[in-house]
Amino acid sequence: MNTLTSPRPGPAPAHEAQANGPTAPPGRGRLVNDAPMRMFHWLFALSFVGAYLSADSEHWRLVHVVLGYTVAGLLAFRVVYGLVGPRPYRLSTMGRKVSGAWAWLQTVRAAWTPGGAQPTVAWRQAPVFLMAVSLVALLAVVLPLTLTGYGTFHEWGGDWGGEVFESLHEFFGNTALSLVGVHLALLAGQSFWRQKNLALPMLTGRLEGRGPDLIAHNRVWLAVLLLLCVLAYLGWELVIAWR
């Protein structure tokens, strides 16, 4: 081998290392999800599943309502965290991904148009864009889902209005469930394609492989605070129900 044509790469400049974040030690993986986002994810998932399963039972109606309000509160946290949190979780970052998905669809359309420019389509980007769109759509549908549920519970508009709100609430609930299914299917498909468990980082926060951490700080304290706020709200509702 000619060693002159394959020089050993030197260390990255200091400013590049700071921009990319600290490099994960071998065997630990890269930090890609911080503790608050993981806590939000699982509280949101459990609250949504619990609310959906208790939707058709009059006996568990209060549980359904309380868990629905919990989902709405978690959405509020996600919006705030999307404004002041780490860059990967910013709403602007999500917006750019959705815009990228639209641009990608335009590329696909141009590639399938006879006599067009026939651009090269990056098919590997499809799951990434679909994942981003499904997550944004899921978060967006929570607001009308909560509002229609609130209107149903408080019987806005009398009997006629209650039926309308109930139908809309059921529609948005099924839409949200469908988006959850799309999210899980994309996650499973990407995990199979890349031969990596892409769901594991939402538990451990780390993704297998070497490279810089995407998140500089884990912020365990904020995750604990979020959990305590949710538990305090559930406890408060429980005390009121017993009175």
Locate each region found by the language model.
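Membrane-embedded alpha-helical bundles that constitute the cytochrome b-like, heme-associated redox core
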Residues: 1-243
